[in-house]
Amino acid sequence: EEALAAVRAAKPDAQVNPGFQGQLKLYEAMGCAVDSSSVLYKRYRLEMLSERLSEPQDLPREVFAVDPTSISQTPNTEVLYRCRKCRRALYRSSSILSHTEGSGPTAFAHKRITDSARLCGNGLEKCTSFFIEPVQWMEPALLGVMEGQLLCPKCTSKLGSFSWRGEQCSCGRWVTPAFQIHKSRVDEVRTLPVGNFHTAKT
């Protein structure tokens, strides 16, 4: 902001490229360091990719998270998410792209409100889905189409949906692009250190 003010002091009509300004803000938000594992970085990369896509025929390999089945062990600090029906490992907690809670279904009053977007019994809006980064097992479903269903790669049960144009979360927030997994279709599996096993059982 100070640099921009200095430039405009000399040239009042000077403008900054919005994309470059967005990159600078992202860099600042990440603590002035490039962190490809940051949720902010992952979300920004996907947003930029979605703006360029018309029919995704060839997606960059780096946008896909590693399939957890190809990893021998999940770090103790991470939660593993499995298909509730067949127990196939689907993604890790580091793949979840959190978002700011929206203002509820009323934010999309002009659109058809889905059942999952209705108010909960206690009057509070809740996120009934996880929005995640694409995982390697999703690639065949994503190629050549802008939206579709996300099915378990093992048992083919429906897990959620995706849309490069974006989807509405039940909290009212519009997420673009969206790779949405319904919480009711997955189970959390937490890995405990060996020393805590006895404590966890009791």
Which positions does each model-derived feature cover?
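PTP/DSP superfamily signal
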Residues: 1-130, 136-147, 187-202
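Short amphipathic alpha-helical segments with coiled-coil-like heptad repeat character
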Residues: 32, 176-180
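Short cysteine-rich clusters marking metal-coordination/redox-active sites
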Residues: 83-86, 152-155, 168-171
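Short functional micro-motifs and their immediate structural scaffolds
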Residues: 91, 160, 174-177
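Short cysteine/histidine-rich zinc-coordinating motifs and their immediately flanking basic loops
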Residues: 95-101, 164-169, 180-186
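Cysteine-rich micro-motifs
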Residues: 107-110, 167-173
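Cys/His-rich Zn2+-binding "zinc-finger" mini-domains, especially FYVE domains
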Residues: 142-158
